[in-house]
Amino acid sequence: MEKNPPDDTGPVHVPLGHIVANEKWRGSQLAQEMQGKIKLIFEDGLTPDFYLSNRCCILYVTEADLVAGNGYRKRLVRVRNSNNLKGIVVVEKTRMSEQYFPALQKFTVLDLGMVLLPVASQMEASCLVIQLVQEQTKEPSKNPLLGKKRALLLSEPSLLRTVQQIPGVGKVKAPLLLQKFPSIQQLSNASIGELEQVVGQAVAQQIHAFFTQPR
């Protein structure tokens, strides 16, 4: 996997309703959870972990990747710098990896401007990936990954659950925030003043600190 071809972030043909998966995921729990619900095509030499379409991919950061250090960053940067791809970063946020999450969050959301979705396990990740593929089968104008106005579809349930985890937000305020800021990227870039209009000053400061202050 070290000697990737120069065009390994280029467009890959993905049949409708399929996922093209990096060969390294063959036999994994994540792949097994998806098989039977979605059709997987395994290919070697890919920088992304999964292609949802020829121009939309998932970069998966495992608990082990996060604990091991910053080795995952090179892959994220390659996809971010590619003109061919829109990348979504999915990360395993567990008790073991939680302390490393803020650094990943800052790098992914603030430095690279990419969407970051934490999951608790590969089983939860499989549900998220399947949901994203189902959205890909819709016409492009209704695809939440291609249109900001439809981004709220992604919040059922994965993005919504992610926002609920932000200190001070909870189940009541999360939907209100997502109506005004329908993606993690938009929410993380919001000013305290903009957030105050939705959730009040105290919670706005908590949200802003969550995204901007590394722990």
Swiss-Prot record:
InterPro entries: DisA/LigA_HHH, FAAP24, PND, RuvA_2-like. GO terms for cellular component: chromatin; cytosol; FANCM-MHF complex; Fanconi anaemia nuclear complex; intracellular membrane-bounded organelle; nucleoplasm. Plays a role in DNA repair through recruitment of the FA core complex to damaged DNA. Regulates FANCD2 monoubiquitination upon DNA damage. Induces chromosomal instability as well as hypersensitivity to DNA cross-linking agents, when repressed. Targets FANCM/FAAP24 complex to the DNA, preferentially to single strand DNA. The lineage of its organism: Eukaryota, Metazoa, Chordata, Craniata, Vertebrata. Keywords: DNA damage, DNA repair, DNA-binding, Nucleus. GO terms for molecular function: chromatin binding; DNA binding. GO terms for biological process: interstrand cross-link repair. It is found in: Nucleus. It comes from the Eukaryota. This is Fanconi anemia core complex-associated protein 24. It holds the Pfam family PND. Residues 160-215 are annotated as: RuvA domain 2-like. The C-terminal region is distantly related to RuvA domain 2, a DNA-binding domain. Belongs to the multisubunit FA complex composed of FANCA, FANCB, FANCC, FANCE, FANCF, FANCG, FANCL/PHF9, FANCM and FAAP24. Interacts with FANCM.
